[in-house]
């Protein structure tokens, strides 16, 4: 009887292991947490799906559970905890707040985490069983674009950033360092602790005499670009230079832009490798750094900006 009980328990244990990462349908679960919806993060998601499919993953064989945190880090944490409780086979987290939430939730669970578009990848170094893709802005290239359109170097540049995004203060310092190459250039930054105050913060920088704004890779601020920031700056005829192509499409003047479809593809490829049996330790973090230059001719015309002839540019205006 003891032997029968032992083998029954052993069989139950084997079944539990084999079903780890499976949903009620019997399929393994791929969890995807997107911090919020704006152009670059949506492109990341599309890239993740393409990266999975292009690297041998038939998504019909999996339950893909996609959740969106609507720019709320607390919601990201709850969503990550839920995916861990469901024993997802892998969790893909798009943007830094979601990545940190997923890594915290999955710690000691054995569930691998693949992050996507984490600008300061050092924030993930203390976690185990994680890998992913990093989007590193080239602020030197960005300032070449800004000064080309503005026609001078001695600019006061306004920067808004969210205190909830750990990579944003690092980006501010990198931008200030790049600005040292331009005589008379000054970076005026303003931290946004409460996103409902972003209108006030935008107007405060305008009152301080900024000539233009430069966006960081800050999802919380970029999420308010169309609804809050651009209506104010357009009325005052103050250009906003975006951090990626989708922002230029919706109203920024220009940008030295990383291709976020490719950032997402890199994370999708990493997740596919994990699902095919590779360990996260065998998959190096990918870093996208080389930008392409874009501008919006309609926006530039409305703001009275002259398109520089000495910079290679692609027009996003439709």
Segment roles from a protein language model:
Residues 273-318:
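Hinge/cleft segment of the Venus flytrap/periplasmic-binding protein
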Residues 18-21:
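C-terminal motif of bacterial Sec signal peptides marking the signal peptidase cleavage site
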Residues 31-33, 83-96, 114, 157-160, ...:
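Periplasmic-binding protein-like
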Residues 29-55, 65-74, 164, 219-224, ...:
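Extracytoplasmic "Venus flytrap"
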Residues 48, 135-182, 284-300:
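An alpha-beta-alpha
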Residues 101, 105-140, 242-254:
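Flexible loop/hinge segments that line or gate small-molecule binding clefts
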Residues 120-126, 131-156, 258-278:
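Hydrophobic alpha-helical segments within soluble ligand-binding/sensing domains
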Residues 26-41, 132, 155-162, 213:
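Short beta-strand segments enriched in small/hydrophobic residues
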């Amino acid at each position: 009887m003891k032997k029968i009980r032992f083998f029954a328990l052993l069989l139950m244990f084997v079944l539990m292991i084999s079903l780890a990462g499976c949903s009620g349908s019997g399929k393994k679960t791929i969890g995807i947490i997107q911090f919020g919806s704006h152009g670059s993060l949506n492109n990341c998601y599309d890239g993740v799906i393409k990266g999975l499919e292009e690297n041998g993953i038939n998504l019909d064989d999996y339950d893909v559970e996609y959740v969106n945190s609507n720019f709320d880090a607390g919601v990201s944490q709850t969503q990550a905890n839920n995916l861990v409780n469901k024993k997802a086979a892998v969790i893909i987290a798009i943007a830094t707040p979601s990545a940190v939430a997923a890594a915290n939730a999955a710690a000691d669970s054995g569930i691998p985490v693949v992050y996507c578009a984490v600008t300061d990848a050092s924030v993930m170094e203390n976690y185990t069983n994680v890998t992913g893709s990093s989007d590193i802005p080239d602020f030197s290239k960005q300032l070449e674009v800004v000064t080309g359109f503005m026609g001078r170097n001695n600019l006061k540049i306004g920067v808004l950033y969210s205190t909830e995004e750990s990579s944003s203060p690092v980006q501010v310092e990198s931008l200030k360092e790049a600005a040292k190459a331009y005589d008379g250039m000054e970076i005026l930054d303003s931290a946004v602790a409460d996103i409902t105050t972003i209108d006030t913060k935008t107007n405060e920088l305008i009152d301080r005499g900024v000539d233009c704004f430069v966006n960081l890779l800050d999802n919380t601020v970029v999420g308010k670009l169309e609804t809050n920031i651009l209506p104010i700056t357009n009325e005052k005829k103050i250009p906003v230079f975006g951090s990626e192509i989708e922002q230029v499409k919706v109203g920024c003047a220009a940008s030295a832009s990383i291709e976020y479809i490719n950032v997402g593809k890199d994370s999708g490829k990493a997740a596919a490798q994990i699902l095919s049996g590779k360990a996260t330790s065998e998959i190096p973090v990918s870093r996208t750094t080389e930008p392409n230059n874009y501008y919006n001719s309609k926006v530039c015309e409305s703001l009275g900006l002259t398109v520089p002839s000495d910079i290679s540019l692609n027009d996003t205006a439709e």
